[in-house]
């Protein structure tokens, strides 16, 4: 009588998160923090896909790879936020237009 959570449920959640992340990048091009959070949502959706397929197929490779992706995503977020803090201290703004002005 209980509801069984299958692979399609996980894939649906991952697709929704991926879509939200993609929309966040395309609809909000002015705020760097929102873009960074949207990239993290996309990586989270990829991790959900990796873990769900890994569990469905009974193979641990996808789960190990998801841990690797989580580690790289955490490092990317930390480095990105550190760069934004330094940029804000130097320029007083973190708008995308100001960051584009840094191109040589």
From Swiss-Prot:
GO MF annotation: an example: NADH:ubiquinone reductase (non-electrogenic) activity
User: Where in or outside the cell is it found?
Assistant: Cell inner membrane
Broadest EC class?
translocase
Q: Which GO terms describe its cellular component?
A: NADH dehydrogenase complex; plasma membrane
Main localization of the protein described in the UniProt heading: membrane
Q: Where would you find the membrane-spanning parts of this chain? A: 7-27, 33-53, 67-87
Q: How does it sit in the membrane?
A: Multi-pass membrane protein
EC number of this enzyme: 7.1.1.-
**Reactions it catalyzes:** a quinone + NADH + 5 H(+)(in) = a quinol + NAD(+) + 4 H(+)(out)
The record's annotation in HAMAP family points to:
NDH1_NuoK
Assembly information from the UniProt record:
NDH-1 is composed of 14 different subunits. Subunits NuoA, H, J, K, L, M, N constitute the membrane sector of the complex.
The protein's matches in PANTHER family, at most eight in alphabetical order, are given as: NADH DEHYDROGENASE SUBUNIT 4L-RELATED (PTHR11434:SF21), NADH-UBIQUINONE OXIDOREDUCTASE SUBUNIT ND4L (PTHR11434)
- Job description of the protein: NDH-1 shuttles electrons from NADH, via FMN and iron-sulfur (Fe-S) centers, to quinones in the respiratory chain. The immediate electron acceptor for the enzyme in this species is believed to be ubiquinone. Couples the redox reaction to proton translocation (for every two electrons transferred, four hydrogen ions are translocated across the cytoplasmic membrane), and thus conserves the redox energy in a proton gradient.
Name of this chain's protein: NADH-quinone oxidoreductase subunit K
Source organism of the structure:
Xanthobacter autotrophicus (strain ATCC BAA-1158 / Py2)
Organism lineage: Bacteria, Pseudomonadati, Pseudomonadota, Alphaproteobacteria, Hyphomicrobiales
């Amino acid at each position: 009588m209980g509801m069984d959570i299958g692979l399609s449920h996980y894939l649906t959640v991952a697709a929704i998160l991926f879509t939200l992340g993609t929309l966040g990048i395309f609809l909000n091009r002015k705020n760097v923090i929102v873009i960074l959070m949207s990239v993290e949502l996309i990586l989270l959706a990829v991790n959900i896909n990796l873990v769900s397929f890994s569990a469905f197929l009974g193979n641990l490779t996808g789960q190990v790879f998801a841990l690797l992706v989580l580690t790289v995503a955490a490092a990317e977020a930390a480095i990105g936020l550190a760069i934004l803090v330094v940029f804000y201290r130097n320029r007083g703004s973190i708008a995308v237009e100001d960051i584009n002005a840094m191109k040589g």
